[in-house]
């Protein structure tokens, strides 16, 4: 329905999200997990991609996941072998437990570039406050009443953001990068936004604005 309604207006669609865990995921009861349990992951993926392609043959269709291990690579391989019309690979990079660092970012890009498809960093977050404990496996399980931004971590956030976007924007394989939270508290109540709760910009906002303007502003 949505793809048909916005045909010709929206180019890129995240067709299906987080399929790596779907075969065993039963934490939340919803239509997607029930359908996957009944018919299998690949059947579900093939059906939703076919429906999206039929609704808008010119749209660019993404598969997307937070899992950047070889399990995601295997899912992509199976999809391509089955003829699923994937146009780009989505990578989530919610870094609530700490910045990935340049080495991991480059390694992830290199591994997923082997498919010959554009790589999109679809959900990127960097914190300017206390990090989530490393033992948390599902980020949604971490629920706190107060999660404040901290001045010295705001500096760290903008430094990490600058390094990360420098890598992404200069990679021939990465074609898009989306910052997930504009304001603090938008997801998990985390201080992961570019602006604070009161709407004032953090150093990361100014840094990203400068990066974008210097690269894309009309000459």
How would you name each of these model-derived features?
Residues 24-28, 68-83, 101-109:
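Distinct, well-ordered alpha-helical segments
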Residues 47-62:
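Active-site lining segments of carbohydrate-active enzymes
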């Amino acid at each position: 329905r949505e793809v048909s309604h916005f045909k010709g207006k929206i180019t890129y669609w995240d067709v299906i999200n987080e399929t790596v865990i779907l075969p065993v995921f039963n934490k939340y009861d919803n239509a997607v997990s029930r359908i996957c349990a009944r018919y299998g992951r690949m059947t579900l993926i093939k059906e939703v991609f076919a429906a999206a392609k039929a609704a808008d043959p010119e749209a660019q269709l993404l598969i997307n996941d937070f899992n950047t291990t070889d399990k995601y690579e295997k899912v992509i391989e199976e999809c391509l072998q089955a003829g699923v019309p994937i146009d780009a690979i989505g990578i989530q990079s919610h870094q609530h437990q700490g910045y990935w660092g340049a080495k991991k970012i480059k390694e992830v890009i290199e591994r997923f570039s082997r498919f010959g498809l554009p790589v999109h960093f679809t959900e990127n977050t960097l914190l300017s406050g206390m990090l989530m404990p490393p033992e948390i496996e599902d980020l949604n399980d971490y629920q706190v009443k107060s999660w404040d931004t901290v001045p010295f971590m705001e500096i760290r956030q903008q430094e990490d953001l600058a390094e990360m976007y420098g890598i992404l924007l200069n990679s021939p394989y990465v074609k898009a990068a989306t910052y997930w939270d504009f304001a603090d508290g938008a997801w998990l109540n985390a201080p992961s936004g570019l602006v604070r709760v009161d709407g004032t910009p953090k150093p990361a906002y100014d840094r990203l604005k400068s990066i974008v303007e210097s690269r894309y502003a009309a000459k």
